[in-house]
């Protein structure tokens, strides 16, 4: 019996163990399932909550934008057009006792305040009551001062207290004064606030003036800038007027040769030399006027004429030129514009442009000068019909002006092959007859030769006193004295013209009368 019980107990024990294991596994599975369900549930619950938080944050960000879109308060001085405009006198506006209590004689600015005060005295009082149907109109107040911007109803202020403060501060008596800048204020609080910042910051104008007040600085700067602009405009306008003055010589040439009017007029830009300041002053002191033949001082000739380089021997004769420049007749005075009145194409006549002197021609030696002069030669043109006396005299002045400019600066006597015939081309193309040509040559070269004789005599004395070395020039053939203008002209083939014109004066030809 006992053995059976033991066997049954042993047999039941594994079953119990198996059942326990099953229970444990089942519980474990349930636990795992439950834990998984909890995790899934928690996960499913977490994400929607997070999304809700994000949506709430986005809504909070949108709310300020909607709040800023609310209607703002009107700016001061921009009232509602439908508002009621009230104009008070200065006395009424500044009165402190408009409404007085008959018991204690206390004054009030508003009737509402007086009615509330009457309640304390057990007096009958009445407050204004508005019905719901009554249309409320806004009230605006204009400034009593006629010169004030707020006197206009369109710039009225919407508050009675505000208009009172405005009138008191801007137009009332200013009793309070700043000790630093002497600025006055009508309200003591404003003066105290100003004194805290007065002098702590400086405003400097471009002209060097210092200001402690910004408003004074702004006013001064506006005036200073306007004054500077006006001064600059006055300086620029006269220069433009001088630069735009037409050359009378060029005007006559363009009128005489209208078919060459389309040709451009190149300008001269020659670098000035310090040694040529004397000749520059001599040329500037003489101004040739082709209209009336008078000599006028040209104050603005520096804007049109540039000096040319001089050689050493020319510098030594500066005092001679200074002494004898008064000998030159007024009609031989060079026109500054004459330096640009030559013609680059001699075959077309004398109406074109061109430069008498090259852009950058250095000081030429005697040999180079003679070679250039030899290239000129003498030009032969067919006889042209005679012209009037006016054209003859005008072109005579033109030729005289050109020769004066050439003789003034011998270093730039001839600049290029394009200008070889510039001396006589305008003269030959102008339609002179033989008699007019001889008169022009005689008047022009006769005056220059007479002046040159005086200059040469003074130059010989100077060279003798200085040892004889200052009057020499270096060329390819060595040292030799400077050639006179007579030698240069005779070498260039012009001497015969001068001699013939001089002899014709003494012995006039039969056809000349």
From Swiss-Prot:
Zn(2+) 1 binds at residues 178, 181, 194, 198. It is found in: Nucleus. A motif (Nuclear localization signal) lies at residues 163-170. It holds the Pfam family C2H2-2nd_BIRD-IDD. The modification Phosphoserine is found at residue 89. A zinc finger (C2H2-type) spans 99-121, 141-171, 176-199. Zn(2+) 2 binds at residues 205, 207, 220, 224. Residues 51-60, 264-280 have a biased composition (Low complexity). Its main location: nucleus. This is Protein indeterminate-domain 11. It comes from Arabidopsis thaliana. The lineage of its organism: Eukaryota, Viridiplantae, Streptophyta, Embryophyta, Tracheophyta.
